[in-house]
Amino acid sequence: IGLVGSEMCIRDSLINAQHADLVLFTGDLVNNVATELDEFIPILEQIKGKDGVYSVLGNHDYSPYIKWETEEAQEANLNSLKSKQAAMGWKILNNDHVILHHHGDSIALAGVENSGNPPFPNYGDLQKALKGTEGMYKILMSHDPTHWHREVLPESDVQLMLSGHTHEMQFSLFGFSPAKFVYPEHNGLYQEGKQSLFVNIGLGYLMFPMRLGAWPEITVITLHKI
């Protein structure tokens, strides 16, 4: 979310109107510091899912882009962000998973810490996150879509990965975005065999306080048993 300019950009009523089983947030809740979240907490804590609201950390959530006096101060900022999410009723999946049960079926929802190519941080541990999910349908939240080709496709059977990160570079004109030159998978649905990736382009902005064509979005995904 970061600096979205106004809390009106976040429509908790629109999200709740979907009556979702799960609400998932794939990272970069702030741009630099945990206090950016404070004005949005009254809205975000109203977002509900029948089976909960889950999140993962993105590269900005670690606050690596500002100068901290000490490593301890930076760590305290991250812990503050985690605490604020917990207070909102969100559960962060840091290289972990939960098992969800519906009508006799089980789905594994897993999440990893940011797993990016340099210079972005890589704290993700995919194998740890998936341990114990063998044979289940798996949804993986991983902030950076480059994780898909780097590790998820070659080393796992995750059926659906959900990412963010690209923001579509906040610009899209007639379907063209410069994000395509940096991220092969930068917006929407991608498939390789029986595995899929969906990249959501987020709500807020970074550096430039505007979006052109790459409008803020939420994504509604319906899973069908086949």
What are these regions (language model features)?
Residues R11-H101:
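Core catalytic region of metal-dependent phosphoesterases/phosphodiesterases
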Residues L29-V30, H60-D61, H97-V98, E113-S115, ...:
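Catalytic metal-binding/acid-base residues of hydrolase active sites
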Residues E45, I139, P145-T222, I226:
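Conserved beta-sheet core of the metallophosphoesterase superfamily
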Residues S6, S106-S115, I139-H143, S196-I201:
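Active-site-proximal beta-strand elements of phosphoester/diester hydrolases
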Residues W90-K91, H97-L109, K131-M136, Q191-S196:
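Beta-strand-turn-beta hairpins that frame and shape the catalytic cleft
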Residues S6-E7, V30-T35, S63-A76, P118-P121, ...:
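Acidic/histidine-rich helix-loop elements
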Residues Q18, L44-K50, K131-E134, V152-S156:
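Short, conserved loop/helix-junction motifs that constitute active-site signature segments
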Residues I1-G5, C9-I10:
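Single conserved hydrophobic/aromatic residue that forms the stacking wall/gate
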